[in-house]
Amino acid sequence: MSTSHASAASARETTEGTVYTVTGGDWDEVVQSAAKSDDERIVVNMGPQHPSTHGVLRLILEIDGETVTEARCGIGYLHTGIEKNLEYRTWTQGTTFVTRMDYLTPFFNETAYCLAVEKLLGIENEIPDRASIIRVLLMELNRMSSHLVCIATGGMELGATTIMIYGFRDRELILDIYELITGLRMNHAYIRPGGLAQDLPPGAVDQIREFVKKMKKNLPEYDKLATGNPIFKARMQDVGYLDLAGCMALGATGPILRSAGLPHDLRKSQPYCGYETYDFDVPTADTCDSYGRFLIRLEEMRQSLRIVEQCLDRLAPGPVMVADKKIAWPAQLALGPDGLGNSLDHIKKIMGTSMEALIHHFKLVTEGFRVPPGQTYSAVESPKGELGVHAVSDGGTRPYRVHFRDPSFTNLQAMAAMCEGGQVADVIVAVASIDPVMGGVDR
C-alpha cells in the first residue's frame, strides 16, 4: 500500500489541503520511500527514566533539528490501582490509600476524600471547628511544601542549584512539623472521615509559629535568586505558553489557569472547611507562560503564611472528631510511642471498661461504618489545581466506586500545546511549570 498525490491536488491545496490517493503496493516499499524522504525529523524518547521528567514520565518527541514538531506523553509507569483497591477497603481505610496518590500533597488527597465521604454521610455540618481549622492549617503548610519542591526541582533543571538547596532546606522544616503532628513525613492518613485521627501534640503550635517567622524571612531570597536573575527570567519568559482559551479547552486549573489571568480558586468560588472566613488573595498573572506560573507559586506561599497565622489564632480547645459513635472510633486510637497507634492508655480503657465497648470497637474497626447509598462530587484546590473526588456508595461498608480528578493528569494534557513549535530545551521548562506528580497521574 502506498500514497501519492492526486492529479487534482494542486487545485485544492489552498482550501482543503493536499489530497492523497491510496493505491495497491507493498508496505516495505512505503517504508523505504519514507526513509528516502528529505525530511530529517526524528523521534526521541525523553524518559521514563530521566532526571527532568518529575518521575517516570515518558515524553515522545518528534524533532526537526532543535524544534519540537510533535510531543506526546506516555503515562502509566507508576500505576498502583488505588481506585480499585478502595473498593475492597472500609471507608476509613481508604485514607491510607488516597494519601499515596500525589505523594507531595497527601493532606489534600485525604481532605478531598473525607469531604466526599462526609457529604454522603450527611455530616458535613457536624465536623468540629477545631478539626476544620487543623485541616486548613495542614493543607496550607502542604501547599507551601509542594510549591517549594516545584520551585526547587524546576530551578535545578535550569541549572539554578542554589534555588534547589534553599527550597529543600525550607521544605525540611515543614516535614519536621508533619512528623511531630502525624508521626510520619509523608503518607499520613491523619485526616479521617468525621475529623482527625488525633489532636495536635504539645509543642506543635509553637513549632509552626517559629516556622512562619523563618519562612517570612526566607521567601525574599527566592525573589533575589530568581526574579533578579536575567538568565533565569530569559529561560522561563515566553516558554510553555498557554492562553486562557487553551486552558479552558484543555480543562487546566491551578497556577496554569491563573497565569492566564483568570482568578479561579475553589477556596473562593466553592469554599470548604470554612475557607470563606479566611482573609487571603488569589494571585494571577497575564503572561500565560512558565515565568508567570513561577511568580504565582511564590505569591501563593505568602498567602498560605497569612492563612496559617489566622488558623493559629483561631485554634480553641475542643473535639477533633464527630460525636457520632457509629463513625468515630473510641478514643480515636491515639498514637502510641511506637508510632503505630493503640496507645497503652487507649488499650487499657477499651479492654477494661466493658465487653460491649470492646465488641463495638472491634466491629467498627474491622467491618467499618455503613454509608447511605448515593453519589457525590467533592473538590478542593490543591497546589496543582482542582482535585476532585467522585464517590459512589451502595449502602455498604466499602465504597462502590471512587474516582479522582487529579489536576496533574488533566494539566499534563497541555504539554503538547506548550511544547510543539518550541525548542527541545524548553520542554524541560514547560513540564516543570506544569509540576506533574506521576503518583497522582497514574494512581
From Swiss-Prot:
Gene Ontology molecular-function annotations: NAD binding; NADH:ubiquinone reductase (non-electrogenic) activity; quinone binding
- The principal localisation class reads membrane
Q: Cite the EC number.
A: 7.1.1.-
GO-annotated cellular components: plasma membrane
Is Nuclease given among the entry's keywords? no
Q: Which PROSITE patterns match?
A: COMPLEX1_49K
Q: Write out the annotated subcellular location.
A: Cell membrane
What Pfam families does its record include? Complex1_49kDa
At the top level, the lineage of the source is Bacteria
Q: Which SUPFAM superfamilies match?
A: HydB/Nqo4-like (SSF56762)
User: Topology with regard to the membrane?
Assistant: Peripheral membrane protein
Listed InterPro entries: NADH_Q_OxRdtase_suD (IPR001135), NADH_UbQ_OxRdtase_49kDa_CS (IPR014029), NDH1_su_D/H (IPR022885), NiFe-Hase_large (IPR029014)
Q: Which UniProt keywords apply?
A: Cell membrane, Membrane, NAD, Quinone, Translocase, Transport
Q: Which reaction does it catalyse?
A: a quinone + NADH + 5 H(+)(in) = a quinol + NAD(+) + 4 H(+)(out)
Briefly, what is this protein's role? NDH-1 shuttles electrons from NADH, via FMN and iron-sulfur (Fe-S) centers, to quinones in the respiratory chain. The immediate electron acceptor for the enzyme in this species is believed to be a menaquinone. Couples the redox reaction to proton translocation (for every two electrons transferred, four hydrogen ions are translocated across the cytoplasmic membrane), and thus conserves the redox energy in a proton gradient.
Regarding protein family, the annotation reads: Belongs to the complex I 49 kDa subunit family.
Quote the subunit structure annotation: NDH-1 is composed of 14 different subunits. Subunits NuoB, C, D, E, F, and G constitute the peripheral sector of the complex.
- Protein name per UniProt: NADH-quinone oxidoreductase subunit D 1
Q: What organism does the UniProt record list as the source?
A: Streptomyces avermitilis (strain ATCC 31267 / DSM 46492 / JCM 5070 / NBRC 14893 / NCIMB 12804 / NRRL 8165 / MA-4680)
